[in-house]
Every structure is written in structure tokens, then in C-alpha cells.
């Protein structure tokens, strides 16, 4: 494999509570444990994984803006911001970094208000309803797109 690929993983509000919050929906693996597993996989794929989790929209937007020059791809689980944040949408459009939107649960089989995403139509793809495996599939997809298909 060639050059290292820099990936930014963004986790939105309440994802800091993974492993303890609604485990029947989100599972019992904590965010630190998930990140440890993802970092191992990313390393095997010759990727460098940077991570941010915030419950504050402006913090995520600032991180997206600062990633413009040094990030090749974004994986974003916007959580509740999926359904409300035109500001995150605009930030992603502005930086022109390709991204994959992911959701642990199937947002289309839950409450009606969760079925609209402000990001899906501008993303490279959406992974939802596959649990924490969705994060791993996002890494594999990026590897296929940026490394193996060059």
C-alpha cells in the first residue's frame, strides 16, 4: 500500500455514552473500546485515524473546518445532528472532503423525525442499522476507494 490515508472520525451528541445508553439499540461496547478496535483496523489498512466526539455542534464544525488541508476522508456519525444541523451540512460542503455518514441504528425504522438526514444527499454513502460494524465497513470502503482502486 502507498501513502498513509488520514481519516477523521466524527461522533456527535450522546455517543460518548456508548456502552451505557440504550444498550438494546446501541450495544454494550464503549466509545473508547470501539476506538481502540477501529485504530487497529485503520493501521492494518495503512490509515491514520483521528477522532472527535462532541455534544456541541460548533466544536464539530470547527474540527471539520480545520481538517481541510490534512484529512483525506471523513466518517461521521452525526447522531441527533443528522436531523437538525444545516450548519454541519454547510461545513462539509465547504471543505470538500469526501465523507461517509454512518448510524449505529436504522434511522429509517425508528421515530418519523429520525428518518430525514441533512447529510445523506451530499455524502459518498450512508451506512445505517449495522450496529458498530458500520464503522468498520466505512473504513473498508474508504480503503477500497482510496487505496485499492487507484
UniProtKB/Swiss-Prot annotation:
Pfam families in UniProt: DHquinase_II
Q: Which Gene3D superfamilies match?
A: Dehydroquinase, class II
Q: Name one GO molecular function term.
A: 3-dehydroquinate dehydratase activity
Q: Where is this site: Transition state stabilizer?
A: 21
Q: Which residues form the active site?
A: 26 (proton acceptor), 103 (proton donor)
Q: Give the enzyme class.
A: lyase
Q: Which UniProt keywords apply?
A: Amino-acid biosynthesis, Aromatic amino acid biosynthesis, Lyase
Enzyme Commission number = 4.2.1.10
Cysteine pairs forming cystine bridges in this chain are none
- Which reactions fall under this protein's catalytic activity? 3-dehydroquinate = 3-dehydroshikimate + H2O
Describe its function. Answer: Catalyzes a trans-dehydration via an enolate intermediate.
NCBIfam families attached here?
aroQ, PRK05395.1-1, PRK05395.1-2, PRK05395.1-3, PRK05395.1-4
Q: Which HAMAP family match?
A: AroQ
Can you say what this protein is called? 3-dehydroquinate dehydratase
Organism of provenance: Buchnera aphidicola subsp. Acyrthosiphon pisum (strain APS)
Task: Identify the gene encoding this protein.
Answer: aroQ
